[in-house]
Regions:
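A noncatalytic interaction/capping subdomain that flanks phosphate/NTP-handling catalytic cores
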Residues: 1-134, 139, 153-154, 164-317
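Active-site flanking residues adjacent to catalytic metal/cofactor-binding acidic residues
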Residues: 161
Length: 317
């Protein structure tokens, strides 16, 4: 089941923090695109993944946001409570690490969109010959599969496989990554053989995923901190639609983003003020890029060739 988010008051936050405090065994500060995020937990399996996933932060820096991650029999499974004033999130009975790291990124996004004019995009971002491509879509549409398919080409470099931050600079959009390593699926190597052996079988968690250093496969120079975004491909999976690929007008692309919650289920606050902010950011994003809609009901290779055709790349072979 998906997790549920409830907004809480600062007073409720204080009560929950006091309740969790005696159980805290691990306190880790990490840097996520300039934000200091503090993880507090008693789960011995969590710190290793977290520290492999995100860059370390000096312990002398005060945190901008906090994540408490604990089991609690008094709470339902996958319960998230968030105080937007102190930027503190409580995750109770959330065992899937993918949600832990996405909520951490969502917490950073909440801070950055309010205070620095920086937007969050739940999607993959790669650089091909100096031009940035973003792929977004609902869960299961294939953005991760197609991202790693593109990385098989030596001219492709990756910024992020799941989440990036974007900022307007004049006529351009700069896209920034924030993760040290990526949380990948075990079945990736079944689709693209180049990734076979990247992670030992016993290192995958119960969800069939692991935090992996893809530099071992693609090389150290192919993980970039940023790129200039020029193209957005929105992925969908609709077996009833025979059309595979089509360009989108700006209004069509904006409508798809807004109707689908910006393709981001990890936004912690959804209210009229935040919606106005996000509509403006996404409008800026779309207004400075070429947008396409791609139906991914074909084979991974067929979809990969369609993505490459947009970029003027040779077929996937």
């Amino acid at each position: 089941m998906p997790y549920t988010i409830s907004l809480i008051s600062p007073e409720e936050k204080e009560q929950l923090a006091e309740r969790c405090a005696p159980r805290v065994k691990y306190e880790i500060k990490s840097e996520i695109f300039g934000c200091c995020i503090k993880l507090l937990s008693d789960d011995r399996a969590l710190p290793g993944k977290w520290q492999e996933n995100f860059y370390p932060m000096s312990q002398n820096i005060r945190s901008h946001g906090r994540l408490f991650v604990f089991s609690d029999p008094s709470c339902a499974e996958n319960t998230v409570r968030f105080d937007p004033y102190s930027k503190t999130a409580f995750l109770f009975n959330v065992s899937y690490y993918g949600w832990v790291k996405s909520i951490a990124l969502g917490l950073c996004g909440d801070i950055l969109e309010d205070e620095h004019g920086i937007s969050s995009v739940h999607g993959a971002c790669v650089d091909v010959g100096g031009n940035g491509l973003a792929m977004v879509g609902i869960s299961g549409a294939g953005k991760t599969t197609q991202t790693y398919g593109l990385l098989r080409d030596p001219h492709t470099r990756i910024i992020s496989d799941d989440w990036f931050f974007a900022r307007v600079f004049g006529p351009e959009i700069l896209a920034y990554g924030s993760e040290r390593n990526f949380y990948i699926r075990q079945d990736l190597s079944a689709i693209w053989k180049e990734y076979d052996g990247l992670v030992a079988a016993e290192e995958y968690d119960a969800d069939g995923r692991a935090v992996a250093d893809i530099r071992w496969v693609v090389g150290k120079g192919r993980l970039l901190p940023l790129t200039t975004l020029s193209t957005i491909i929105i992925l969908k999976r609709d077996a009833a639609d025979p059309q595979v690929l089509c360009p989108l007008e700006k209004g069509e692309a904006l409508d798809l983003f807004t109707r689908n919650g910006y393709f981001n289920p990890h936004l912690l606050v959804r209210d009229p003020r935040k919606t106005a902010l996000r509509d403006r950011y996404i409008s800026d994003l779309i207004g400075r890029t070429d947008c396409y809609l791609l139906n991914t009901t074909g084979t991974p290779k067929t979809t990969q060739d369609a993505v490459r055709s947009v970029l003027g790349m040779p077929g996937s072979g």
